[in-house]
Regions:
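Short Lys/Arg-rich cationic patches that frequently serve as NLS/NoLS or arginine-rich RNA/DNA-binding motifs
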Residues: 2-8
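Catalytic toxin/effector domains delivered as secreted proteins or via bacterial secretion systems
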Residues: 15-113
């Protein structure tokens, strides 16, 4: 039987949005085009970055974790890496690696640009 896909359990009126992502200067995460959850999972399987944006930290974190687990089977939640730069975002990444890349998510104090 196929594994059931995870989705965010509680969506607020401003549900998180997913975007393609690239890394900018000083750890900044730069938003690209808006994408669907399925597109985000495909990007993550290919080792590319995505970012979950919205005003609800809990929903963003939950959605990012679901994307990473659906794409790669297991995900490790990581704080912003100090060596990445002052604008780095928290994220999920495969554990163990590969593939490369991250599922970033916004917080009230750290956002994608």
């Amino acid at each position: 039987m196929a594994k059931k896909k995870e989705t965010p359990s509680s969506l607020s009126s401003s549900a998180p949005q997913i975007y393609e992502a690239t890394l900018g200067r000083n750890g900044a995460v730069v938003k690209g085009q808006k994408i669907t959850q399925l597109q985000a999972e495909a990007r993550r399987r290919a080792g590319l970055d995505v970012v979950v944006c919205g005003g609800n930290l809990s929903a963003n974190r939950s959605f990012a974790g679901a994307i990473e687990r659906n794409a790669n089977g297991n995900g490790k939640r990581c704080p912003p890496h100090p060596n990445a730069g002052m604008h780095a975002l928290p994220h999920y990444q495969p554990d163990p690696r590969p593939p490369t890349g991250h599922t970033f998510y916004e917080t009230p104090n750290r956002t994608a640009c």
